[in-house]
Amino acid sequence: MRRRRLRAWGLLAGALLLALAALASLALGSRPVPLAVTLDALQAVDPHDDRHLVVRELRLPRTLVALLAGAALGVAGALMQALTRNPLAEPGLLGINAGAALAVIVGVALFDLASMGQYLGCAFLGAGLAGIAVFLLGQARETGTNPVRLVLAGAGLSVMLASLTGIIVLNAPPEVFDRFRHWAAGSLSGSGFALLGWPGLAIGAGLATAFALAARLNALALGQEIGRALGVDLRLTWLLACLAVMLLAGAATALAGPIAFVGLVAPHLARLLAGPDQRWILPFSALIAAGLLLGADILGRLLAAPTEIAAGIVALLLGGPAFIVLVRRFRLSRL
């Protein structure tokens, strides 16, 4: 009971810190906005005050995108690590990032797509098709879905799709590469409220599915045979979990580009704080990953003002060394 209360207080503290980070995201940037003006802009927009327009039309949408995409990547990473029982698993193992990138570059190079909405549709389509292909390739006729087969299928498909993407980029006109790299770098600039519609619904459905599977994932952590003895339908659990990962990682990749590291490290930090229970790991992963991506976006705006560094690049630059320190300080078995 005491541990549950501590976890609940930890979630509450994390939510409060995330709210403060979101407020900082609205106020900070190439042109800082005073906190009082930021709060006024959230309550009622003054169309004659350009600071209100900066907060409401530019920073609020990208803050929401960072929160949604980060939470989705964190939960997707926790699901992947629970399913494969591999501490290095992350959403990219399903080929979702590679599938989304290939679909976007095909759309830009062959169909001259230019708007963020069009990128969004292509990325989500490519991510979904890649995830379905990996799930089908990971099936074993005798035992159903196999974690090792799934990881190998995802790694192989990712390499193949990345190669195709590279071929198209190298042979495309320079303007095609310029349009593609903005999305591929994981930049959140240019996000608008219009882009949050159906990706937000997909993330909501994925989160609901993931949280509903938490108890089954706890049973599977004991081994497939014990899980089956406890009444867990392994094939159905795998199917629903993979569907949740595809929805979460696909929508996040479509919104923010192929963000690496966030979905890998957030579940490890969540386990350090919450223990091995997936009912707590999943919400902690959502909060931590949302904070990591939002923090990377804020830092990218401050370090390179008046321009900015894409959040995906900042996450890679800071995340790699931080994860190495984390692994060296704590035994891998504890992670």
Predicted regions and their residues:
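Alpha-helical transmembrane segments in inner-membrane proteins
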Residues: 1-335
